[in-house]
Structure formats: structure tokens, C-alpha cells
């Protein structure tokens, strides 16, 4: 919005030439981060008071850790603060004509809406289950598949008209079409190694990455500050990849596929980092507010969508290794429990408690130890992910 305003002012008179600074992506990225940070810090206390007044407190289930029982009643659904700060800051600072940012915003707010309904049912309607799993996955799948069908052609072409033409051609050809190299699966640490996916393969991969990332972040969000800081670090790192991928010069030098317009995602990533740090101010131990599903599902979906656009799905799995391991710990725990119950008549557990962060708590780690150590691991994983920019 401010970019368009600056361009309009420059057209009116040469005296407004200093507004040329708005043309620089890096300047707008810094301003987006600062704007989201300030919005979050200033609005945070008011949002917390509002959630407290509405009695939107976190319910603690009976099988939870004893040390968590004192958290019962802490305001939840604080993710609305994060999403609000991200949306306002992004809309202010990004190029409104950029399709990729609109897609990420739509996916983020769509998953946020799913999380909001889930939280609302748990907290207000006093339904401990919230949205049923099938219902939640259905709506996640709808958003994921729609986003995938658009992105598969959007990444292949630079104009909306051509995107529609490609979609029609794909249908007329019997759902069979070759995609350009930039739509392939990139393998990190190797020069120009890209596996062609085809339309169906791209859609399936996109669906799995977006929905999987969303749920993985949600499963990680179980301790004060545990999920939000890794989201900030991974999001900021993806912003670097977006900047490189969207630059014809840097992408050619670093042997990355050039995707016109992808660089504008740096604005969204910066806003997400700023909003996340603002939320951490209130979410650090002992937390004054929890993000709830409205925040966790949305942020995870955003990370997955950005990774798809900049073609860094595997790197996302590396940098977001904590999210991956947390999700796998739940799946393995449930699978092993069901298998042993059928085979031996009683369910057995691989971990003392899932997700993994609760296993470490049961093993004697303090909550703050788990959180900070997971942060350190994420920082190292993000550095490894960033080395793929040059080590190829």
C-alpha cells in the first residue's frame, strides 16, 4: 500500500523523490518487521485483557503434566494478535500486485480461521475435543489443494492470464502436462539437481507440505515460547531464500531457479518475524497468553506455503527439524500403542509422553530447559539450511 502511495507521490512532483527508498525491498522488509513488532507490543496488553474478560482461558486436560495444571485459565487464542500484526504490516509494506504474498496471506488467514473455530469450541463451548479431526483435516485439505492448484501454474507463469490458460490446457490434455524446471523438487547441497514432479506430483507435495507443516507447528506448541521462536527463525531464514529466488542476479549466481515476484515474500517473512517476537514478549515463561490453534495452524501453514513458492521443501524439513520430530513422535507413539494393543492386549509406549517435549519433561528436564534447548537446535538447523545457499 505504501509502495503504491510513494510511486503516486513521486509522479506528482520531483520534490517527493526521497520516497524512492520505498522501492528497495530490504528497506520495506525492515520496516515490515518493525511495524509488526510495534503493533504486537502495543496491542498485546489490550488483547490479553480482552481475552481475560471474555474468559477465554486455556483448558488443561486431566492427563497433562502436573507442572502445567497452574496454567489452567491462562488466556488463549492469542494467535489473533500475531495474525493481526502480520496482516496489517504486510498490507502496508508489500507490493499489492504481487500474487505470491496474497496466496500466503490467504492460506495463513484460512488456517487461522480453522484454528479459531477449534479454539472457540474448546474454550467457549467447553468441548474438550474442539473440531473433530476429520472436520479439521477436511478444511485444511480444501485450503491446501486450492492453494496447490493455483501455485503449480502460478510458479510456471508470470501473469494471471497465462495461469488460467495453463489450467485450461491441463484439463484439455487429460490432466497431463510437463512443468518448467523451476516447478521441480530441488535437492539441497547439489548443483542444479531438480526432479520433475508434474502437475499431480506438485499438488500432492504442496498439500503434504502445507497441511503437514501446519499440524507440526500445532503439535510443537505445548510449552511457553516453544513454538513461536522456531517459527521466527525458520520464517526469517525462508525470507533469505525468497530474496535470492526472486532476484534474477542472485538466483543465477547461486544456481537457484528464478521465480519472478518471490522476493516480495521477504516482506511477509519479516512481518512474521516481528509479530512473533512481539508475541514472545508475552508468551515467554511464565506465559501471559497462549497462541492457541488459531496461531499455530496459521503460522505452520504460512511456513509451508512459502517453502513451496521458493522451492525449498526439503530445506524447510531441515530448518524446521524440531517441528518434524515433534510430529513424528506423536505419530510413532500412537501407531506403536495401537499395534501393541492389538498384538499383546495392552498398549505400550515408545516415549514417556508425546509430543517429544513432554517426554523430556517426564525425564526430569525443566520446562525452560526444554524450550531453550529446542531453540538452540533450531538455530543450528537454520544455519545448516542457510549453508545450502552456497554449498551446492
From Swiss-Prot:
Pathway: Cell wall biogenesis; peptidoglycan biosynthesis
Keywords: Cell cycle, Cell division, Cell inner membrane, Cell membrane, Cell shape, Cell wall biogenesis/degradation, Magnesium, Membrane, Metal-binding, Peptidoglycan synthesis, Transferase, Transmembrane, Transmembrane helix
CC terms in the record's Gene Ontology section: plasma membrane
EC number: 2.7.8.13
Catalytic activity: UDP-N-acetyl-alpha-D-muramoyl-L-alanyl-gamma-D-glutamyl-meso-2,6-diaminopimeloyl-D-alanyl-D-alanine + di-trans,octa-cis-undecaprenyl phosphate = di-trans,octa-cis-undecaprenyl diphospho-N-acetyl-alpha-D-muramoyl-L-alanyl-D-glutamyl-meso-2,6-diaminopimeloyl-D-alanyl-D-alanine + UMP
GO MF, one annotated term: phospho-N-acetylmuramoyl-pentapeptide-transferase activity
Entry-linked InterPro entries: Glycosyl_transferase_4 (IPR000715), PNAcMuramoyl-5peptid_Trfase (IPR003524), PNAcMuramoyl-5peptid_Trfase_CS (IPR018480)
Obligatory cofactor(s): Mg(2+)
Transmembrane regions listed in the UniProt entry: 24-44, 76-96, 100-120, 137-157, 193-213, 225-245, 262-282, 289-309, 314-334, 369-389
Major localization listed first in the record, in broad terms: membrane
A GO BP entry: cell division
Pfam families: Glycos_transf_4, MraY_sig1
Topology within the bilayer: Multi-pass membrane protein
Record-linked PROSITE patterns: MRAY_1, MRAY_2
Localisation: Cell inner membrane
Family that this chain belongs to: Belongs to the glycosyltransferase 4 family. MraY subfamily.
Primary role: Catalyzes the initial step of the lipid cycle reactions in the biosynthesis of the cell wall peptidoglycan: transfers peptidoglycan precursor phospho-MurNAc-pentapeptide from UDP-MurNAc-pentapeptide onto the lipid carrier undecaprenyl phosphate, yielding undecaprenyl-pyrophosphoryl-MurNAc-pentapeptide, known as lipid I.
HAMAP family: MraY (MF_00038)
Name of the featured protein: Phospho-N-acetylmuramoyl-pentapeptide-transferase
Organism annotation: Paracidovorax citrulli (strain AAC00-1)
Amino acid at each position: 500500500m505504501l509502495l503504491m502511495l510513494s510511486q503516486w507521490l513521486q509522479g506528482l512532483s520531483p520534490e517527493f523523490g526521497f520516497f524512492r527508498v520505498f522501492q528497495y525491498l530490504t528497506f520495506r522488509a525492515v520496516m515490515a518487521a518493525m511495524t509488526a513488532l510495534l503493533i504486537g507490543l502495543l496491542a498485546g496488553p489490550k488483547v490479553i485483557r480482552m481475552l481475560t474478560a471474555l474468559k477465554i482461558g486455556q483448558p488443561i486436560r486431566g492427563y497433562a503434566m502436573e507442572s502445567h495444571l497452574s496454567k489452567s485459565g491462562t488466556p488463549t487464542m492469542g494467535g489473533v494478535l500475531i495474525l493481526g500484526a502480520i496482516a496489517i504490516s504486510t498490507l502496508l509494506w508489500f507490493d499489492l500486485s504481487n500474487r505470491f504474498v496474497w496466496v500466503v496471506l490467504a492460506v495463513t488467514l484460512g488456517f487461522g480461521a480453522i484454528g479459531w473455530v477449534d479454539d472457540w469450541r474448546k474454550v467457549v463451548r467447553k468441548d474438550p475435543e474442539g473440531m473433530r479431526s476429520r472436520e479439521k483435516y477436511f478444511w485444511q485439505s480444501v485450503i491446501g489443494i486450492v492453494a496447490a492448484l493455483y501455485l503449480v501454474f502460478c510458479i510456471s507463469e508470470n501473469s494471471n492470464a497465462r495461469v488460467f490458460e495453463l489450467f485450461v490446457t491441463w484439463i484439455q490434455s487429460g490432466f497431463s502436462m510437463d512443468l518448467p524446471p523451476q516447478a521441480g523438487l530441488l535437492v539441497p547441497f547439489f548443483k542444479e539437481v531438480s526432479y520433475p514432479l508434474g502437475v499431480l506430483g506438485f499438488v500432492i507435495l504442496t498439500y503434504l507440505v502445507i497441511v503437514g507443516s501446519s499440524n507440526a507447528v500445532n503439535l510443537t506448541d505445548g510449552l511457553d515460547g516453544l513454538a513461536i521462536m522456531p517459527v521466527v527463525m525458520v520464517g526469517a531464514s525462508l525470507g533469505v531464500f525468497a530474496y535470492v529466488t526472486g532476484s534474477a542476479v542472485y538466483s543465477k549466481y547461486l544456481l537457484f531457479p528464478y521465480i519472478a515476484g518471490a522476493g516480495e515474500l521477504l516482506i511477509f517473512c519479516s512481518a512474521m518475524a516481528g509479530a512473533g517476537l512481539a508475541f514472545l514478549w508475552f508468551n515467554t515463561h511464565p506465559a501471559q497468553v497462549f497462541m492457541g490453534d488459531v496461531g499455530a495452524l496459521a503460522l505452520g501453514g504460512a511456513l509451508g506455503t512459502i517453502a513451496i513458492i521458493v522451492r525449498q521443501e526439503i530445506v524447510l524439513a531441515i530448518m524446521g527439524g524440531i517441528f518434524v520430530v515433534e510430529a513424528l513422535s506423536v505419530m510413532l507413539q500412537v501407531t506403536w500403542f495401537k499395534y501393541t494393543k492389538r498384538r499383546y492386549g495392552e498398549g505400550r509406549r515408545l516415549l514417556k509422553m508425546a509430543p517429544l517435549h513432554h517426554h523430556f519433561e517426564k525425564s526430569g528436564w525443566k520446562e525452560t530447559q526444554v524450550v531453550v534447548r529446542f531453540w538452540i537446535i533450531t538455530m543450528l538447523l537454520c544455519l545448516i539450511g542457510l549453508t545450502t545457499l552456497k554449498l551446492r
